[in-house]
Amino acid sequence: MSADAPGGERIAKLIARAGVCSRRDAETLITARRVALDGLVLDSPAVRVRPGQRVTVDGKPLPEAEPTRLFRYHKPKGAVTAARDPEGRATIYDTLPEGLPRLMPVGRLDIASEGLLLLTNDGALKRRLELPATGWIRRYRVRAFGEVDDRRLKGLAQGATVDGVTYGPVEARLDRMQGDNAWLTVALREGKNREVRRVLEHVGLRVNRLIRMAYGPFQLGSLPKRAVEEVPAKVLRDQIGGLLELPPRPRHPTRRGAG
């Protein structure tokens, strides 16, 4: 089935809002013929779902779409940002407290990195917040070994190409020296794999600690390691209301598992 019925909501968006996966991953599920509408297997994401129609993914009914929720999580070093790891290493889900809804990470922090990781139950929101076009700055505190060349450090503001990969502008500032290590503040608007480590290595600095302090308007602040704190509904609406239409949600913020 691939016809697009008038009205209703795009099926990939509906699956993402139900917290099953991101919108892009939902489109992949559909083209892989793993999604059905009223019992008919779909092969195109260009389908709208009307109220009362039944959607299944891998034969299981689609969960009711929950109100959009966003959480701040203090990721510890040594946890993989993934649902499972083929090498058997601990993942962020092994460190999360019980009682949370099904959550997806916004972007990622590699296993050796720590600090602020946003989690959401809304796949569409996850995708929007990951896009560089959103314009949100990711800010990091970085400890790195090596001699700081201030001219090369400032040159990162023009972007850099490392091993054939082009990175956008990076703001890097030396805060202080601690023995043979430098503490820096680094800010960027995109999140390519291991970007901070690679651009600093490009200017002769080897990162040995990386802490994300902020993702857009959301700050790590004093949130303890492994703790999760929900972003209050009003703050969520104020900060991302222009990105997605969010229904009002009378709920109190929660903090869990400072562990």
Cite the ranges covered by each PLM segment:
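Basic, flexible Lys/Arg- and Gly-enriched helix-loop patches that mediate nucleic-acid binding at interfaces
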Residues: 1-259
